[in-house]
A protein has these predicted regions:
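Alpha-helical transmembrane bundle of multi-pass membrane proteins
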Residues: 1-188
């Protein structure tokens, strides 16, 4: 989970920074990728109760691999609309994957370790993002090659996620409620 979190976070940050290297109008590209980000987060929020984390991350990982690979193929002669679509779809899948990962994180860890695991994942993501501005300053295809490699790594790790069944989730919720009621009973 830590590797997936770090790779998605650093991939998102890299895609944000390397928008200026894609051969298209920067303002227009930034506007469309921001719109795609908002749509991705809304879709993730709507589908979150119905989608499993493993399948969703694999789907978004495959989409981000394909779209970031297509961004690598862009040249100065590429049409603006094609470049905008490729970069926006790459960001869409990264935003979708990160939103699902954030919302479903609690389903993968026991209640007592949830805060610790979120903190460790955020620390690792922050450490990896320290190096991403250096990557994004390279010439056009190289930041997107690194982005594609990051997307491939987290998609490969997503295949190994073991989800809890509905029964296990309800048992965890029941245990958390019992311990909460015991704590409030002892406080009074």
């Amino acid at each position: 989970m830590f590797i997936i979190w770090v790779m998605i976070g650093s991939g998102y940050y890299t895609s944000s920074l390397c928008l200026k290297n894609v051969p298209v109008d920067f303002e227009k590209n930034g506007l469309y990728t921001s719109i795609f980000d908002i749509v991705a987060i809304l879709v993730a929020g709507c589908l979150s109760p119905y989608a499993g984390i493993r399948k969703t991350l694999i789907f978004s990982g495959m989409g981000s691999i394909v779209s970031s690979s297509l961004v690598i193929s862009l040249t100065e002669e590429s049409s603006d609309s094609l470049a905008i679509f490729y970069t926006s779809s790459s960001r869409f899948f990264l935003s979708y994957g990160f939103a699902i990962l954030y919302m479903k994180h609690a389903a993968l860890f026991p209640t007592f370790f949830l805060g610790t695991s979120l903190g460790m994942c955020h620390f690792g993501k922050g450490f990896a993002m320290f190096f991403m501005p250096m990557v994004a300053e390279a010439e056009h295809p190289w930041p997107n090659i690194v982005l594609t490699i990051c997307n491939t790594i987290w998609t490969a790790f997503a295949f190994f996620i073991i989800e809890k069944s509905a029964k296990e989730l309800s048992e965890d919720e029941k245990y958390a409620q019992e311990s909460h009621s015991q704590d409030s009973h002892q406080a009074s």
